[in-house]
C-alpha cells in the first residue's frame, strides 16, 4: 500500500500559546521559522487540557495524556478522572486488590506504607487519592499506617509541600491520630526515570533503612522549612526519615501501596522495590543495600512495567485499540519513532495507548514490537538539570532524523523535542528561551529536507503547554504545565483546517487524511481538514 504523502508528526513537548510578555519563553525566543510557517501554512490553536484530553475540567494537560490523545484519535477517560471517581464513591474500600492488602496487613500485624507524590498537581498523582486510600484503610481497621511522601514542586508551585503536609497532619488528627509521616523525599530522587540510580538509592535507603549517617528529622514541617532556607524547592528536598517514628522503615511483612498513577516516573523506583534483577541492583549506588522486595507486599495503583515484578495492581490496564501507530502497522506501512531518553516512552508506550506494550508483553515500555516500526533513541545529556544544557539533544535528534528521511523508507515518523517541557520545568526562563530558539532552527532543517525535497508533510503540535508561562502569579518561577492552547500546523498549502473545537485528539485522524488513508471506526474524533 502506498500513501498519498509521508508525514512527520513533530511534537514540541510543552510548547503552548499565550500573549507575548515577560515570562513567555516561546514568544520571546524570536522563533523566526515558526512565525514564517504560521504565515505560510494552515494552522489552528488546539485544546490539550481538561475534558478535551479525558481529564477533569480545568486540569492542566501533561506529557502522558497528551501523547495518548495525539495517537488515539479519540477522547479517553484518563487515570486521574478514574481515580477521582473512585474517591467520590468510596471505591478503594471495594477494590479487591486494596482490600486484600488491608487484610494482609491485619493478618501479619504489620504496617501499611503509602508512598507517592503528595501534591494536587494531578500529573503523576493526586494527594486526594492517597488520603482516600488512607481513610479506607482506617475504616478497615488498620492502625499502623505510615506515609512515605514524595514532594513535588514541579507540577505545582516550587514551595508548597509545607501546605500539603499540614493538610495531611490535620487529616491524621481528624482520624484519631492514626498514621505517621515516616519519610520525605523530593521527586528529583524518588521519581528519577533516567537511570540516575544514585538518586533512587537515596530515596530507597531512606524508606527501607534507619542508618545513623542518613538525613533525618523529628518534625516534618520544620524539615521542609529548613530545606527552603537552604535554597531547595520541593522537588529537590533531600530524602530523610522521621527519627521520632518507631520502626519508620519498610520492614518484612509490611505492605506498600505506590499511589502514583502515571507509569514513567514510577517504573524505576517500583522496579527497585520489587525486582532484584533490575539493573539498579548492579550499580555502585546499591552496593551493600538490602533488597526488601521479597519480604513485602507491593501494590501499584496502575500497571507500570513488567520490570515491576509485583503481581498486585489495583487498577489493571484497559489498552486502546487501533491507535495511529497500530493502525499504520496493520496496513503494512513503515513508521519510525525518534526521541531522546527522557521522552522515548512518550513516543512509544504512551503514543500507542499502552496497547503494543500490554498486548505483547514487552520488557520495557519504551520498546516497540509493532510490525514495520523502528525506534531511534538519542541519549539525553547527563546534567543535573536541563537549564545547564537547554538545547538538550535536539540537534542530535535532527541529525539522525535527516539521515532517516534521506532513505525514503518511512511513511510516518513521530518525533519528540523535549526542550520546552524539560527546560521549562527548571523554572529558568532565560534557559528555556534558548531551548525554544534551538527548536526553531531544527524545525527549519527538517522542513527544508522533508517538505521541500521529499514532498512530505509536517504536522507540528504539542502535547501540552509549559514554556509559554515561566512566571507565576506571584512573580516567581513557574515550573508546571498549563491549560494553554497549543498549535497544530500542517505544512500543506493545498488544505484548509477547521477551527471548530480543535483538539489534539483530532491529530491522528488528520494525519490519516493527509496520507490518503481511511480513518478506523475506533477513532471517534474527525479529521480537521475541510472537505471541498
UniProtKB/Swiss-Prot annotation:
It catalyses: (2R)-2-phosphoglycerate = (2R)-3-phosphoglycerate. Its EC number is 5.4.2.12. SUPFAM superfamilies: 2,3-Bisphosphoglycerate-independent phosphoglycerate mutase, substrate-binding domain, Alkaline phosphatase-like. Mn(2+) 1 binds at residues 421, 425, 481. Mn(2+) 2 binds at residues 13, 63, 463-464. The keyword Manganese applies. GO terms for molecular function: manganese ion binding; phosphoglycerate mutase activity. Keywords: Glycolysis, Isomerase, Manganese, Metal-binding. GO terms for biological process: glucose catabolic process; glycolytic process. Pathway: Carbohydrate degradation; glycolysis; pyruvate from D-glyceraldehyde 3-phosphate: step 3/5. Belongs to the BPG-independent phosphoglycerate mutase family. This is 2,3-bisphosphoglycerate-independent phosphoglycerate mutase. It comes from Mesoplasma florum (strain ATCC 33453 / NBRC 100688 / NCTC 11704 / L1) (Acholeplasma florum).
Amino acid at each position: 500500500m502506498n500513501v498519498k504523502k509521508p508525514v512527520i508528526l513533530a511534537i514540541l513537548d510543552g510548547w503552548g500559546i499565550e500573549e507575548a510578555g515577560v515570562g513567555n519563553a516561546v514568544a520571546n525566543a524570536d522563533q523566526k521559522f515558526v512565525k514564517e510557517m504560521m504565515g505560510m501554512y494552515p494552522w489552528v490553536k488546539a485544546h490539550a487540557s481538561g475534558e478535551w484530553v479525558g481529564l477533569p475540567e480545568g486540569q492542566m494537560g501533561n506529557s502522558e495524556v497528551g501523547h495518548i490523545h495525539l495517537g488515539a484519535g479519540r477522547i479517553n477517560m484518563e487515570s486521574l478522572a478514574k481515580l477521582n471517581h473512585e474517591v467520590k464513591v468510596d471505591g478503594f474500600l471495594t477494590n479487591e486488590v486494596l482490600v486484600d492488602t488491608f487484610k494482609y496487613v491485619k493478618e501479619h500485624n504489620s504496617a501499611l506504607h503509602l508512598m507517592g507524590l503528595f501534591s494536587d498537581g494531578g500529573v503523576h498523582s493526586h494527594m486526594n487519592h492517597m488520603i482516600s486510600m488512607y481513610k479506607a484503610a482506617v475504616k478497615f481497621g488498620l492502625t499502623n499506617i505510615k506515609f512515605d511522601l514524595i514532594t513535588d514542586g514541579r507540577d505545582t508551585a516550587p514551595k508548597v509541600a509545607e501546605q500539603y503536609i499540614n493538610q495531611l497532619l490535620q487529616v491524621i488528627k481528624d482520624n484519631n491520630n492514626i498514621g505517621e509521616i515516616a519519610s520525605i523525599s523530593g521527586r528529583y530522587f524518588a521519581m528519577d526515570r533516567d537511570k540516575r540510580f544514585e538518586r533512587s538509592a537515596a530515596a530507597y535507603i531512606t524508606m527501607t533503612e534507619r542508618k545513623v549517617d542518613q538525613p533525618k528529622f523529628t518534625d516534618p514541617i520544620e524539615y521542609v522549612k529548613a530545606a527552603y532556607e537552604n535554597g531547595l524547592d520541593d522537588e529537590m528536598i533531600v530524602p530523610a526519615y522521621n527519627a521520632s517514628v518507631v520502626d519508620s522503615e519498610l520492614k518484612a511483612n509490611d505492605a506498600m501501596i505506590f499511589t502514583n498513577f502515571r507509569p514513567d516516573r514510577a517504573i524505576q523506583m517500583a522496579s527497585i522495590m520489587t525486582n532484584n534483577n533490575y539493573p539498579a541492583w548492579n550499580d555502585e549506588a546499591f552496593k551493600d543495600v538490602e533488597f526488601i522486595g521479597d519480604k513485602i507486599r507491593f501494590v501499584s495503583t496502575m500497571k507500570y512495567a513488567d520490570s515491576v515484578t509485583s503481581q498486585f495492581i489495583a487498577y489493571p490496564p484497559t489498552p486502546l485499540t487501533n491507535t495511529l501507530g497500530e493502525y499504520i502497522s496493520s496496513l503494512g506501512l513503515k513508521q519510525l519513532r525518534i526521541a531522546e531518553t527522557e521522552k522515548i516512552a512518550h513516543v512509544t508506550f504512551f503514543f500507542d495507548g499502552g496497547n503494543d506494550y500490554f498486548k505483547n508483553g514487552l520488557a520495557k515500555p519504551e520498546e516497540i514490537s509493532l510490525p514495520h516500526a523502528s525506534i531511534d533513541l538519542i541519549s539525553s545529556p547527563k546534567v543535573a538539570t536541563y537549564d545547564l544544557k537547554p538545547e538538550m539533544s535536539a540537534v542530535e535528534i535532527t541529525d539522525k532524523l535527516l539521515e532517516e528521511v534521506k532513505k525514503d523508507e518511512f511513511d510516518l515518523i513521530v518525533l519528540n523535542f523535549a526542550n520546552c517541557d524539560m527546560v521549562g520545568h527548571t523554572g529558568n526562563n532565560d534557559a528555556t528561551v534558548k531551548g525554544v530558539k534551538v527548536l526553531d532552527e531544527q524545525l527549519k532543517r527538517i522542513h527544508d529536507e522533508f517538505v521541500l525535497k521529499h514532498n512530505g508533510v509536517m504536522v507540528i503540535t504539542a502535547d501540552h503547554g509549559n514554556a509559554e508561562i515561566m512566571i507565576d502569579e506571584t512573580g516567581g518561577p513557574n515550573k508546571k504545565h498549563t491549560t494553554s492552547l497549543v498549535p497544530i500546523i500542517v505544512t500543506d498549502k493545498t488544505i484548509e483546517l477547521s477551527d471548530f473545537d480543535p483538539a489534539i485528539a483530532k491529530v491522528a485522524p488528520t494525519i490519516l487524511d493527509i496520507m490518503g488513508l481511511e480513518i478506523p471506526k475506533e477513532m471517534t474524533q474527525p479529521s480537521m481538514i475541510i472537505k471541498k
